[in-house]
Amino acid sequence: MIRISDAAQAHFAKLLANQKEGTQIRVFVINPGTPNAECGVSYCPPDAVEATDTALKFDLLTAYVDELSAPYLEDAEIDFVTDQLGSQLTLKAPNAKMRKVADDAPLMERVEYALQSQINPQLAGHGGRVSLMEITDEGYAILQFGGGCNGCSMVDVTLKEGIEKQLLNEFPELKGVRDLTEHQRGEHSYY
């Protein structure tokens, strides 16, 4: 479920040494399965462990995960990275905002997952997002842009050179993508 690097385990062990005896860590997701999902790590004293928690035993510590967060922390990684500027703890949870779908799931679900997990995080840097409205019988993914993408002069390039290429590469059964958005240029538009 969660991989914690040796460096991160050593970092946590050092922090836990200053806590009450038996204290471990808890890894959790707030608002799991939503675009606002946020992951976190906190101390978990022995009296805070719930019967429904999953205990993940590592060499230097135990990480507890609550029942609701568990599916969203699948494939999560915690690392402790040191560079010229200092060191920091990183937590990558690719499924926090949306549960990973099975390879044999319907095309609509697989495309939606790709949009939410791969494409929207890139568009979010410009305050934008894209939603899958439908997949036509002819095999076209009909998309709607929102936020900073609505009315942006670069939306055609983003659609054809970015999103379409990525989706066609990942889903050969698609014929292409089409934009359903009625673009309204305004202050919200990125370019």
Swiss-Prot record:
Which example biological process does GO assign this protein?
Answer: protein maturation
Q: Does Protein biosynthesis count among this protein's keywords?
A: no
Q: Which GO MF terms does the UniProt record name? A: 4 iron, 4 sulfur cluster binding; iron ion binding
Task: Tell me any Pfam family this protein matches.
Answer: NifU
InterPro entries per record: Fe/S_biogenesis_protein_NfuA, FeS_biogenesis, FSCA_dom_sf, HesB-like_dom_sf, NIF_FeS_clus_asmbl_NifU_C
Cofactors (names): [4Fe-4S] cluster
Q: What does the entry comment about cofactor binding?
A: Binds 1 [4Fe-4S] cluster per subunit. The cluster is presumably bound at the interface of two monomers.
Q: Which UniProt keywords apply?
A: 4Fe-4S, Iron, Iron-sulfur, Metal-binding
Record-listed [4Fe-4S] cluster binding positions: 149, 152
> Source organism's superkingdom?
Bacteria
- Coiled-coil annotation reads none
Subunit description: Homodimer.
Q: What does this protein do?
A: Involved in iron-sulfur cluster biogenesis. Binds a 4Fe-4S cluster, can transfer this cluster to apoproteins, and thereby intervenes in the maturation of Fe/S proteins. Could also act as a scaffold/chaperone for damaged Fe/S proteins.
| Family, similarity comment | Belongs to the NfuA family.
Q: What is this protein called?
A: Fe/S biogenesis protein NfuA
Q: What is the scientific name of the source organism?
A: Salmonella typhi
